[in-house]
């Protein structure tokens, strides 16, 4: 199983290590042609507006949308969640606009720029430590979206079909259960596409 990590900016190597720790092959994606042959893609945390500029500069917007249209799973963490969202509070247009959610950037306030919280994640388990760094949260979800985790009544993880998104940085701990959950999504998608 080959998983790409969008390597334009952000916590790229940490995701590579998490993918490899789960027994899959990781590929850092910086060019369009590197999307070929991938089974899934991680959109890492970083700074969403910088990532968007780089996506545009390297001509990755349409290839990423095509990757999604081909039914391949995508996992967005922190800034990656913002890239996936169809709606962003205070912005007229989304980035990739693939997941039927509304997100608010930096929504935990400056006093809480960075913190850790123990989460219970549906399909993953309890006692998962979420590392939040200038994190967004999901304000609203569409009918097809399943809420997987909340923190202080805010949605911090959700899934819609082939798309998985979370507000926190799962790659910054040694608990790889959420990455395993994503890899299972990728396995399921591969099974369906080969039928």
Swiss-Prot record:
Gene that this sequence comes from: pdxT
InterPro entries: Class_I_gatase-like, PdxT/SNO, PdxT/SNO_CS
Species per Swiss-Prot/TrEMBL record: Geobacillus thermodenitrificans (strain NG80-2)
Protein task: Catalyzes the hydrolysis of glutamine to glutamate and ammonia as part of the biosynthesis of pyridoxal 5'-phosphate. The resulting ammonia molecule is channeled to the active site of PdxS.
Active-site residues annotated for this sequence: 78, 169, 171
Protein name: Pyridoxal 5'-phosphate synthase subunit PdxT
Pathway in which this enzyme or protein is active: Cofactor biosynthesis; pyridoxal 5'-phosphate biosynthesis
Reaction catalysis annotation: aldehydo-D-ribose 5-phosphate + D-glyceraldehyde 3-phosphate + L-glutamine = pyridoxal 5'-phosphate + L-glutamate + phosphate + 3 H2O + H(+); L-glutamine + H2O = L-glutamate + NH4(+)
UniProt similarity note: Belongs to the glutaminase PdxT/SNO family.
Source taxon at top rank: Bacteria
Chain sites annotated for binding L-glutamine: 46-48, 105, 133-134
